[in-house]
């Protein structure tokens, strides 16, 4: 085992409780330290909640800069079959299927939406500064040279693609696109969930699907 993706999700106890991790903050960091001691390269995932403000984003950015690991930032997104799908009290402001990709906010944000995306991308820029561009090229020079000798340029181009992919204006534009497929609404909020029913999606036939007979056949 050389690489590990670790779902830390939050760097504070309140965030862990929100994401129902059922683990202490100390235990999370113990797992990270143990992986480091084994020489495993760790990629960390954190979840940005729509309720974050500028100060919260700044705290997370500084933490990401202070550690050597790659940190990925995703957006808190309830999915059918998960616990948060039935316990989340915040109403979704969109059910556009395309936006349920953990890079778009489908629940109301505390900040104006465009400001939330600007802070999100600014935080994700830490990944770009630390691990892409020239920083990545230094560690992959032999690999890059081999690709170039074979006329393959995709790897090199990828190292500088961050700004064309992570762009708050593109995220806002996604919200303005006409909705083609809409997610079925979640059930009424429940305080307690039967764990046996999680991650099990019963067949609902054509319910909630905007597909006609001609398209389906």
Regions found by a protein language model. Name each.
Residues 16-18:
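Short, glycine-/aromatic-enriched active-site segment of Class I SAM-dependent methyltransferases
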Residues 83-97, 101-217:
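Radical SAM enzyme core and accessory elements
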Residues 1-12, 21-84, 122-148:
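Conserved C-terminal portion of the radical SAM core fold
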Residues 12-13, 113:
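Alpha-helix N-cap/helix-start and coil->helix boundary motif
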């Amino acid at each position: 085992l050389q690489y590990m993706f670790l779902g830390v999700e939050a760097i504070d106890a309140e965030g862990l409780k929100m994401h129902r991790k059922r683990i202490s903050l100390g235990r999370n960091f113990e797992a990270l330290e143990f992986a480091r001691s084994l020489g495993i390269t760790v990629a960390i995932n954190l979840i940005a909640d729509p309720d974050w403000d500028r100060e919260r984003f700044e705290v997370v950015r500084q933490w990401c800069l202070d550690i050597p690991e790659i940190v990925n930032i995703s957006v808190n997104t309830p999915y059918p079959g998960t616990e948060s799908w039935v316990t989340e009290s915040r109403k979704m402001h969109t059910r556009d299927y395309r936006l349920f990709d953990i890079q778009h906010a489908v629940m109301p944000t505390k900040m104006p939406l465009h400001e939330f995306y600007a802070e999100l991308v600014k935080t994700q820029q830490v990944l770009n500064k630390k691990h892409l561009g020239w920083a990545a090229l230094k560690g992959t020079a032999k690999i890059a040279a081999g690709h170039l000798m074979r006329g393959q340029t995709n790897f090199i181009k990828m190292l500088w693609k961050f700004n064309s992919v992570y762009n708050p204006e593109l995220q806002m534009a996604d919200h303005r696109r006409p909705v083609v497929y809409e997610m079925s609404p979640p059930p009424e909020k429940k305080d307690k969930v039967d764990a046996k029913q999680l991650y099990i999606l019963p067949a609902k036939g054509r319910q909630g699907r905007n597909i006609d007979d001609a398209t389906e056949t």
